UniProtKB/Swiss-Prot annotation:
Compartments it resides in: Cell membrane
Topology in the lipid bilayer: Multi-pass membrane protein
Record-given protein name: Low glucose sensor SNF3
Glycosylated residues in this chain: 383
Family named by the database record: Belongs to the major facilitator superfamily. Sugar transporter (TC 2.A.1.1) family.
Membrane spanning residue stretches: 98-118, 144-164, 179-199, 203-223, 230-250, 265-285, 359-379, 392-412, 420-440, 452-472, 489-509, 522-542
CC annotations in GO: cell periphery; membrane; plasma membrane
Length: 884
């Protein structure tokens, strides 16, 4: 990988961190807050006081019952970040995003209907005899102007769209363009009795359609979840195909009429489609990213809540909002943007020149593919091939266009943008060349049927690939600060090339004076242009499948060319989401037990997989270790569930609810590289749960770097830090797999004699721990999450409260715990050294965070633990347990 790209990526992350912190503070103002009564039960972390199980129980109960959803700008009422991200995100519903995205695609239907309409109207006998100036037929020049001037209007409409959409919103722009601009143009066309008024009406309608074509894909991209973005934007092209088909069907039913209704009925029906879209938009939300653009975070949160189907205080929704806000603020810090900035690369817009070229080139090659030649002039062309019913053939081509757009909705997310465009372009090239060869060689009815068959193949390939994917890429490729302008430029490029093709095609194909009379030879031109488009796609298009709109910037920084972009796309997705894992995976390296892993890659996986647990019977006999049955995966018990259902199997009388609050991150002289989310595991360990990070001492340890990026600031990327962290994990694995030991102790609560064993799932004892819920923390660690169990050095470590602290803190394990903490202290010191020396107070904060007992243990346990550590300090650590 290019080291410069790695350096730029790292610099970008560092610079964005400050904006992430500021965005987090802003989002606090719209998050859940605790009532004053709840504050009375929280721990004063500054005094170091320890909460008892009773106070902890009361605090969690109050938190569950007293937090309410409010909007407020007074961020002082929210004490810490734990309110924002302490609870697992709820399962998001994709239904509303799908409905919104599909509905606004009606804008594409207007485009397709008007495009197909002119193809049929100019061939109607009544129109040729009453509207055409010579009352016989339209000349090549008249056809050229009549067809192309719609595209001229759309060109200007697309360029004006960003000014309206950035000033007043995406939603008002769509409403204004349909109910006013488009309807005015449509009225002129309905009332036209001659070619002049018909042309003027098409230009005005074109302005409305152009604005819609620039804003609808933009709205879809900004409102839709990333897992559906490609498919939803592709519905815009699908709606275009339906418009073409319906216009052909309507014209087929009216073309035989011998009065003005033959063309006025098809044109007048456009009032229905435009009114349907305009009225429906009143009930849809504004784009959340537009609200961020206008710094209206409360409205942005409400919009996201509507689109994602979760409450406004959901942690997953708030994290998404923080990311959107921080990315936009980072871009805005470089100043306002204009149309010129869309073509200039900068720190806030990496490879912007290439991105702009990619969007414009794709739109141009889409129009140069030859598709609009068939839809604009198909009826006339089929007439000249000897086909008896050209209207029927034209209708068939429209039907093929509709049908094959459906698989394209799935191809774009399943195969990715690059593969779909390359494969589709190759098929289109071959089909065009075959049509040209057959059309030039033979003049028979059989040859005409072969031509029609391969034209249908070309349309099928176009519809499933280039038709929708080009709009997807044009809508998602650009930073938020210039996104509306760039999308408008791409749409304008589409219409400009469309205008050129519509203007010159009659002169190229038709026979007569001042024409080239190419006929079927024009398909050689389309085939050659398709081949050029494939080359451009291969070299310039970056694979953006599965990335958020904000992650696309990182892709362009990391990847030097589009050819290698799929690798970096995979790296980014794996870092953020993790690829698909089996629900249960057995690690054979001797460092872990059977553990559950979340399927983070599949967005359709229910969100209750956020913390998976093992469910089913596991046979741990010496000769056979396998999972017998996994009926289902369930959530870790909630605070309320555990409070109501104490651990009866262990005789637990004082329940301890799980603490899912964030541990404050020590402030360093450098900003954290990425957001972190800490959970108190007890015994001096804090787990960074963000992106499945390992137990973390550094605030940026959740950052996953690829193997090519060794040298980054995280514990997973830095070679020396990674080695040290591996030592810690190896040590814990050694503890997990050490020989079972037992000590007979007396339960201080019940007075019963109990045997405490050193065992794991791989050395199961007779005392089955039915209530242990193991989670895979990665890197050889398994967490027993039931009742806040620490990393499962002991299978029954969650019973420490009920057993008077004798489980994990007895003298038999003191040396082991001391050795583990010694290694963590070494790692903390290496982290301090790496920072280049910090203030003494900062060093103390880091070391205390890594070594101190977390706040959720009781005073009794605290005393025993300190006593154990003192004993361990006076005894040398067993060399056999210290992994080299």
């Amino acid at each position: 990988m290019d080291p410069n790209s790695n350096s730029s990526s790292e610099t970008l992350r560092q610079e964005k961190q400050g904006f992430l912190d500021k965005a987090l503070q802003r989002v606090k103002g719209i998050a859940l807050r605790r009532n004053n009564s709840n504050k009375d039960h929280t721990t004063d972390d500054t005094t170091g006081s320890i909460r008892t199980p009773t106070s902890l129980q009361r605090q969690n109960s109050d938190r569950q019952s007293n937090m309410t959803s409010v909007f407020t700008d007074d961020i002082s009422t929210i004490d810490d970040n734990s309110i924002l991200f302490s609870e697992p995100p709820q399962k998001q519903s994709m239904m509303m995003s799908i409905c919104v995205g599909v509905f606004v695609a009606v804008g594409g239907f207007l485009f397709g209907y008007d495009t197909g309409l002119i193809n049929s109207i100019t061939s109607m006998n009544y129109v040729k005899s009453h509207v055409a100036p010579n009352h016989d037929s339209f000349t090549a020049q008249q056809m050229s102007i009549l067809v192309s001037f719609l595209s001229l209007g759309t060109f200007f409409g697309a360029l004006t769209a960003p000014f309206i959409s950035d000033s007043y919103g995406r939603k008002p722009t769509i409403i204004f363009s349909t109910i006013f601009i488009f309807s005015i143009g449509n009225s002129l066309q309905v009332g036209a009795g001659g070619i002049t008024l018909l042309i003027v009406g098409r230009v005005i309608s074109g302005i409305g359609i152009g604005a819609i074509s620039a804003v609808v894909p933009l709205y879809q991209a900004e409102a839709t979840h990333k897992s559906l973005r490609g498919a939803i934007i592709s519905t815009y092209q699908w709606a275009i195909t339906w418009g073409l088909l319906v216009s052909s069907a309507v014209s087929q039913g009216t073309h035989a009429r011998n009065d003005a209704s033959s063309y006025r009925i098809p044109i007048g029906l456009q009032y229905v489609w435009s009114s349907f879209l305009a009225i429906g938009m009143f009930f849809l939300p504004e784009s959340p990213r537009y609200y961020v653009l206008k710094d209206k975070l409360d409205e942005a949160a409400k919009s996201l809540s509507f689109l994602r189907g979760v409450p406004v205080h959901d942690s997953g929704l708030l994290e998404e909002l923080v990311e959107i806000k921080a990315t936009y603020d980072y871009e805005a810090s470089f100043g306002s943007s204009n149309f010129i900035d869309c073509f200039i690369s900068s720190k806030s817009r990496p490879k912007q020149t290439l991105r702009m070229f990619t969007g414009i080139a794709l739109q141009a090659f889409q129009q140069f593919s030859g598709i609009n030649f068939i839809f604009y002039y198909g009826v006339n062309f089929f007439n000249k091939t000897g086909v008896s019913n050209s209207y029927l053939v034209s209708f068939i081509t429209y039907a093929v266009n509709v049908v094959f757009n459906v698989p394209g909705l799935f191809f774009v997310e399943f195969f990715g943008r690059r593969k779909v465009l390359v494969v589709g372009g190759v098929i289109m090239t071959i089909a065009n060349f075959i049509v040209a060869i057959v059309g030039c060689s033979l003049k028979t009815v059989a040859a005409a049927k072969v031509m029609i068959a391969f034209i249908c193949l070309f349309i099928a390939a176009f519809s499933a690939t280039w038709g929708g994917v080009v709009w997807v890429i044009s809508a998602e490729l650009y930073p938020l600060g210039v996104r509306s302008k760039c999308t408008a430029i791409c749409a304008a490029a589409n219409w400009l090339v469309n205008f050129i093709c519509a203007l010159i095609t009659p002169y190229i194909v038709d026979t007569g004076s001042h024409t080239s009379s190419l006929g079927a030879k024009i398909f050689f031109i389309w085939g050659s242009l398709n081949a050029m488009g494939v080359i451009v796609v291969y070299l310039t298009v970056y694979e953006t499948k599965g990335l958020t709109l904000e992650e696309i910037d990182e892709l362009y920084i990391k990847s030097s060319t589009g050819v290698v972009s799929p690798k970096f796309n995979k790296d980014i997705r794996e870092r953020a989401l993790k690829f698909q894992y089996d629900p249960l995976q057995r690690l054979e390296d001797g460092k872990n037990t059977f553990v559950a892993k979340r399927n983070n890659f599949d967005d359709e996986t229910p969100r209750n997989d956020f913390r998976n647990t093992i469910s089913g019977e596991i046979d741990h006999s010496p000769n056979q270790k396998e999972v017998h049955s996994i009926p289902e995966r369930v959530d870790i018990p909630t605070s309320t569930e555990i409070l109501e259902s104490p651990n009866k199997s262990s005789g637990m009388t004082v329940p301890v609810s799980p603490s899912l609050q964030d541990v404050p991150i020590p402030q360093t002289t450098e900003p954290a590289e990425i957001r972190t989310k800490y959970v108190d595991l007890g015994n001096g360990l804090g787990l960074n749960t963000y992106n499945r990070g390992p137990p973390s001492l550094s605030s940026d340890s959740s950052e996953d770097y690829t193997e090519d990026e060794i040298g980054g600031p995280s514990s997973q990327g830095d070679q020396s830090n990674r080695s040290t962290m591996n030592d810690i994990n190896d040590y814990m694995a050694r503890l997990i797999h050490s020989t079972s030991t037992a000590s007979n102790t007396t339960d201080k609560f019940s007075g019963n004699q109990s045997t405490l064993r050193y065992h794991t799932a791989s050395s199961h004892s007779d005392t089955t721990e039915e209530d242990s819920n193991l989670m895979d923390l990665g890197n050889g660690l398994a967490l027993n999450a039931y009742n806040r169990g620490p990393p499962s050095i002991l299978m029954n470590s969650s019973d420490e409260e009920a057993n008077g602290g004798e489980t994990s803190d007895n003298l038999n394990t003191a040396q082991d715990l001391a050795g583990m903490k010694e290694r963590m202290a070494q790692f903390a010191q290496s982290y301090i050294d790496k920072r280049g020396g910090l203030e003494p107070e900062t060093q103390s904060n880091i070391l205390s965070t890594s070594l101190s007992v977390m706040a959720d243990t009781n005073e009794h346990n605290n005393e025993i633990l300190h006593s154990s550590e003192e004993n361990a300090t006076n005894q040398p650590v067993n060399e056999n347990n210290d992994l080299k």
